[in-house]
Amino acid sequence: MKRDLSKMTCIEDLRLVAKRKMPRMFYDYIDSGSWTETTYRDNTSDFKDIRFRQKVLVNMEGRSLETKMIGQNVKMPVAIAPTGFTGMAHADGEILAARAAEKFGIPFTLSTMSICSIEDVAENTSAPFWFQLYVMRDREFMENLIKRAKDAKCSALVLTADLQVLGQRHKDIKNGLSAPPKPTIANLINLATKPEWCMKMLNTERRTFRNIVGHAKNVGDLSSLSSWTSEQFDPRLSWDDVARIKDLWGGKLIIKGIMEPEDAEKAAKSGADALVVSNHGGRQLDDTVSAIKALPDVVSAVGSDIEVWMDSGIRSGQDILKAWALGAKGTMIGRAFLYGLGAYGEEGVTRALEILYKEMDISMAFTGYRNIQDVDSSILRSTRWAQDEF
């Protein structure tokens, strides 16, 4: 029976439900940043410093948010970002989120560090999805990941460039983050208060990193997986690797994790089809600037050479509209869909997308536009961190 989620009117409503339903370690994994979480907070608060210009007595009928991202038609300029541990927010989480995205008309991106495997998602969806790649020291395993993504008919590869080393994530360390949770006294006590989550997890076999276990050398169980992942992220990743990965993949390539114009120029020259201005949701380098602050300089540098998107900090349709007005031709959402997933599964993801769409649509109308293609920075006023008018 379909639930009535009409009372869920904003992403914050979904966050509060997810916090109540999810085990603490997995909620904290979603809703936290690195070190002091300064960048994590700035990612959202800097959006609030941007103001719209309201226009009145204009025709608001026949509005459209439709556009294209790397040539793919999308209902709005949004793709679901790759997020690790998604299947721990809700049982079979990646499958449910992919289904919701497919039905809504936006792309879904599967993380290397997903709980459901590439094959799991492919078997349970019909639209091609995107796959996100971490570059590992085990190049044979990495090349096999690319082959598996090809075999699953993935339509784009998202290369994450900002995780050569792992950021200092204090909550994850204190919680002893693992998938599945270790049977410690603290975890067992917390899990006892999450009966719905536990029952759903008992009804699935997907409880660990299925892209890795059974595929990487000498990784057949959880004990070996822990040491393997801590050793495998490759700190030697370079632009030469990007060229090699592009050749191996042979399809659409998106580079995620760009924050500076110089790196954006290298991404454009690499032959990538799009780049994502992103600080990994504030989970890598703390005390760097917010993604929305970094966006205008990147757009100025390469906006005519490559599709520029952004993620990190998006919690509303207004945020998406502001990013578009500042030059982002697409966005990616992580926490916004994860809150919906943790709260109500597939229906929750759908509700999150409906909320974002409506907020963006109505806000665009109030700025005097009916088609997203016509929207530019003229809809914005200056901010405290940008003294000149946009």
Each model region followed by its residue ranges:
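Alpha/beta catalytic cores of nucleotide-metabolism and tRNA/nucleoside-modifying enzymes
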Residues: 1-48, 293-311, 315-390
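An N-cap/entry alpha-helix motif that binds or orients negatively charged groups
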Residues: 1-71, 176-237, 373-375, 381-390
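Glycine-rich active-site/cofactor-binding loop and its immediate structural neighborhood
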Residues: 74-113
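Short, conserved beta-strand segments within well-ordered enzyme catalytic domains
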Residues: 51, 66-68, 77-81, 107-109, ...
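Short, basic, glycine/proline-bearing loop/turn elements
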Residues: 79-85, 128-134, 226-228
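Short beta->alpha linker loops
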Residues: 34-35, 112-116, 137, 259, ...
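Alpha/beta enzyme core
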Residues: 85, 99, 124, 140-310, ...
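A gly/proline- and charged-residue-enriched helix-loop-helix capping module
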Residues: 103-124, 128-142
